[in-house]
Amino acid sequence: MKQIYVVLTILLTLNANADWKPLKKLDYYGPKAYTLKKGVAYVEIRKYTETYIPNAAGSGDITKKKAVVFRMYRHPLSHFGSATKHAFGKISPKKSYAFKKGAYASLGPSAKWYYGAFMLDSAGKSWRLENIQDVTDMIKPVDTPADLSLVLWLHSDAQDRSDQKSYSAKYRKSGSGYVIREHHVAHGVGDWVYGCGDYLFEYKINTSGRVTQKKLIRKRKVECGGD
């Protein structure tokens, strides 16, 4: 009887694990992997960083940097005329529209950053997207791995997602939406807002791209500065 119970437990575990599929990181999917809603031609997300570097005089220098970190499009930016491209590149962010804000402080350099999203419509008019939901509204219904990866990235607090040993994600279908589990091991305070540790988060996402639930389902201690 005990052997039957063990076999059934193993089979149920295998069946449950079979429902999960690995979710690739955002840069795995190309900019044309997304089905943009009608009238949308091009969307990009920019990261704005302000770095303070102290000097011996007790003051310091501040440098500002802008970088495009994500694109999705029906037509690439090169499709548009030079005047449209120039106007789009010059459109400035609004702090009230910023998302994924972060900061890093130390005895030496410190930095703070935020992200902003921008859109070109099919007529070549530039728009600021006001929040995360505006971004996901560009692609809903959310129903592909690429869509899910974008929604996860928008809501995740992880700063460094490049190391497969310390970061991974998987997803499965659940009712009319999806469940994502995000695993992250942080060895430094700067790469995870919750500090050093081994974390497993679970997200519930509907096809409108809304995160209906985000919860920490596991946390383990990890030594800061370790490997």
Short names for language-model regions:
Residues 20-164:
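Extended, low-hydrophobicity segments enriched in charged/polar residues
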Residues 117, 200-202:
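Hydrophobic beta-strand positions in blades of beta-propellers and related beta-sheet-rich domains
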Residues 4-14:
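Sec-dependent N-terminal signal peptides
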Residues 17-21, 208:
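Polybasic, low-complexity, intrinsically disordered segments
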Residues 146-199, 206-209:
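Acidic, glycine-rich flexible loop segments
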